[in-house]
Amino acid sequence: MVHELAQVNIARLSAPLESEQLADFVAALDEVNAEAEAAPGFRWRLADDSGNATGIPAFQWDVADSVGVIVNMSTWASVEALRDYMYGGRHVEMLRRRREWFHKVAEATTALWWVPAGHEPTNLESDDPLRYVREHGPTPHAFT
């Protein structure tokens, strides 16, 4: 069976999405998402009717002292394809600025796992790999 890499990444917001503090983040979403979709090895990403996933309720168990949690989930042909996208182009600029928009979290906020090719993971399904990495650390079941 052929597999693809699934990734889930959550972030605790430091301010509401509508706030001035997050204006640059929100303004960049369409461009960053389009860049992902055009990247070699990209397969699928979680999105609602707005074209992004910021309005999709997920991981509410992890809100803690933040105003909310946002989720990013996608599938890729390989670890290398995801890495090349994450650390290149506009996305790496967003990574550099993440402390302006999100709380620093001690626990893992990202999990990777293998899914059958063409499978689109659900929010509920992505909950397990993230909790697993937090409890057990990276293993072949779920890793970072």
What do the PLM-derived regions correspond to, one by one?
Residues 51-53, 77-82:
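Short, charged/polar surface micro-motifs in flexible loops or helix N-caps
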